[in-house]
From Swiss-Prot:
Subunit structure: Interacts with incompletely assembled mitochondrial NADH:ubiquinone oxidoreductase complex (complex I).
Species name: Mus musculus
Record's keyword annotation contains Cytoplasm: no
UniProt key word Membrane: no
Family: Belongs to the ATP synthase subunit s family.
Name of the molecule in the record: Distal membrane-arm assembly complex protein 2
Length: 258
């Protein structure tokens, strides 16, 4: 029985020695490999971040190029068929709708082919209303609408690219424009609304839900003073100026209890 015990004891010592050597090797290798992994991870994240930035810039430039293409001037159509048809084609391609003078129905993108088939009939018919709600119109694209000198109603609500510079061009429609909607345009501020003082023929103006306007109530009051003959739709300025309950003045309409 002594021999087996000796073998077991010898095997245990040999195993413990190997374990210590392995543990020692792991202590020598682990810090270097950990630092190497950390460098590799940081390099990967750095390269990956640069790739994401490059991709974002590429997609942004691609989107800008697409918007600019959609807002190009329809010079050939205007030279061939006149400004009314060119303006109508531009709006229809943007996904909006137009209404010609003395016509009961609006022309929308779903019946654009019918309009194009009879395009010559509209050469001398003024466009009196444009609904460009949600369209990607920008400063450049407005050039297709400014020649519409008989335009009475223009809806530009929720147009993401419409900004203050765009509003500075609308004075060219001052002679005819009576209704204008700018509701929900995220890039329009008080500075752009100040440019509307040229539009003295306006009878209805919607400036509701403009997130870039810092003081909607006060802005509406100023616009109403600027356009005294126009109905201005916007924020409930009375509610915005309402005092908090603890700051309300005392009610003097009822007698005080003794």
């Amino acid at each position: 029985m002594a021999a087996p015990r000796a073998v077991l004891h010898l095997g245990a010592r040999e195993w413990n020695g190997r374990a210590r050597r392995i543990h020692g090797m792991s202590e020598l290798v682990t810090p270097d490999s950990s630092r190497e992994k950390k460098r590799t991870l940081l390099q990967f994240l750095s390269d990956h971040f640069q790739d994401i930035q490059t991709l974002r810039e590429y997609l942004l430039q691609k989107q800008i190029s697409k918007v600019n293409r959609e807002n190009r001037s329809f010079t050939n159509i205007q030279e061939k068929y006149g400004p009314y048809v060119a303006g109508a084609v531009f709006i229809l391609k943007q996904g909006g709708a137009v209404k010609f003078q003395d016509k009961e129905e609006w022309i929308r993108p779903n019946n654009r082919s019918h309009f194009l088939a009879e395009i010559q009939k509209f050469q001398n018919v003024p466009v009196e209303a444009v609904d460009a709600s949600g369209c990607a119109i920008n400063y450049q694209g407005l050039s297709n609408l400014l020649p519409l000198k008989e335009l009475r109603s223009l809806s530009l609500q929720r147009c993401p690219n419409l900004d203050d510079w765009c509003l500075s061009r609308l004075y060219l429609l001052a002679g005819s424009l009576q209704e204008l909607s700018l509701a929900g345009c995220p890039r329009i501020s008080e500075r752009g609304l100040a440019c509307l003082h040229h539009l003295q023929n306006l009878r209805r103006l919607d400036i509701s839900d403009l997130p870039a306007v810092s003081h909607p109530g006060l802005t509406q009051i100023l616009v109403e003073e600027m356009l005294p003959h126009c109905e201005v739709l916007g924020a409930d300025w009375a509610q915005n100026l309402k005092l908090e309950p603890d700051k309300q003045p005392p009610d003097t309409s009822t007698p005080l209890s003794s």
